């Protein structure tokens, strides 16, 4: 479990996210999903980067909007595995009502990790995942190092909130 902090403007978030996803998909024998939070604005770039890495994007990547997708449809989507892009609030609801079983999640990837506070939906998703599952990874990426340096121990709070043990700082 790790938090990677990269310099703003280098496009590192998409590259790191694609690398995490590609590596997790290398062990594709199980049908457990990889949940990607906060990817709404980067979906196109993420698809393109995964395609460049040789991943069959159409086969392994799905997205759902909770308001447009029914509960049974989301349950089937999670059961097929692969990469699921969804909002943190939708993931919270699905974890709480049993649509998404935390023990069946391969891992969670949180983009824009600097936004995670103790009361954020992303933090709640990670807490639910950690409380209900002993397996699986949590990886996070931030492209706003200045937001992690401001305030009192902001980086330490984000690390604690996301339950990660390692921080990687990239230029």
What are these regions (language model features)?
Residues 32-33, 55-68:
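Conserved RecA-like helicase motor-core motifs
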